[in-house]
């Protein structure tokens, strides 16, 4: 988690969360239903986000800025991202799963405790995280290997 403030930079999930339920208060439940989450067409969401970024850039006189989308949610929707951000360059920063999965599970536990307030089945939460993000990685790999995929680089 990080500091929040009205004038501070924020992750893309806030602007994208206007269109799809990827905010922490809802997404921690949706990980339990990957078939639902993976079926969403978020092309319109990315178009809306692109427009918001363009507005921010124009307002600051920095139209040529590069933007970084860092949420792991983008793994699921690379095919839609590619449709909207046609000149994007994807740099996929790989973290060791033995570090990243516990980190995600801890984050999702915090969300569940904040919004559900009940006892959390940690074993079930761990299984859900492993299954969901494993499927997300496979989907992203497939999307980036597809004909016509954007230029991308893997960084470890």
Roles of regions detected by a PLM:
Residues 39-65, 71-156:
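PAPS-dependent sulfotransferase catalytic domain
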Residues 1-67:
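PAPS-dependent sulfation machinery
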């Amino acid at each position: 988690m990080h500091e929040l403030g009205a004038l501070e930079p924020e992750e893309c999930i806030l602007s994208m969360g206007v269109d799809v339920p990827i905010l922490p208060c809802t997404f921690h439940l949706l990980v339990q239903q990957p078939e639902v989450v993976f079926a969403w067409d978020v092309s319109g969401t990315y178009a809306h986000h692109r427009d918001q970024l363009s507005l921010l850039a124009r307002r600051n006189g920095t139209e040529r800025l590069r933007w970084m989308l860092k949420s792991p949610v983008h793994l699921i929707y690379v095919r839609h991202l590619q449709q909207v951000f046609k000149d994007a360059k994807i740099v996929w920063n790989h973290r060791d799963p033995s570090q990243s999965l516990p980190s995600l599970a801890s984050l999702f536990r915090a969300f569940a405790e904040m919004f559900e307030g009940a006892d959390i089945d940690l074993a079930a939460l761990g299984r859900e995280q492993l299954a969901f993000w494993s499927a997300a990685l496979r989907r992203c790999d497939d999307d980036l290997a597809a004909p016509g995929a954007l230029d991308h680089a893997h960084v470890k």
